[in-house]
């Protein structure tokens, strides 16, 4: 197993299936991981059972603490939990699992500092670890800009 640490602006190639993105932190803050996605424009539309799991070409959406997604149907992305709710410190972790990118044009992995205006990521101890096969790619959240959003990966 190898580990790569990415700094702001650096890039690395990521394969197209079975990817884990884990946000971890211990500070007393509610951080949230998101996966924003867009379906490929050339896929065949299909209806889901009871309106769940269907897909349209170019369809956009997000997986986050309100919509945890699914590994069993489109978009093949799932969030395991919402940690740190109420600014609870400790061994907080949230993991997004992407089972397949076959029907997706792209996915953005982003982090949000929930309900804290006028703050930045350097104030906390967050990091995102991408597990791709046996490799780990670590992205420390150290931006000092006054911003509550950070895009970690464009897949």
Language model feature labels by segment:
Residues 1-106, 110-155:
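Intrinsic-disorder/low-complexity signal
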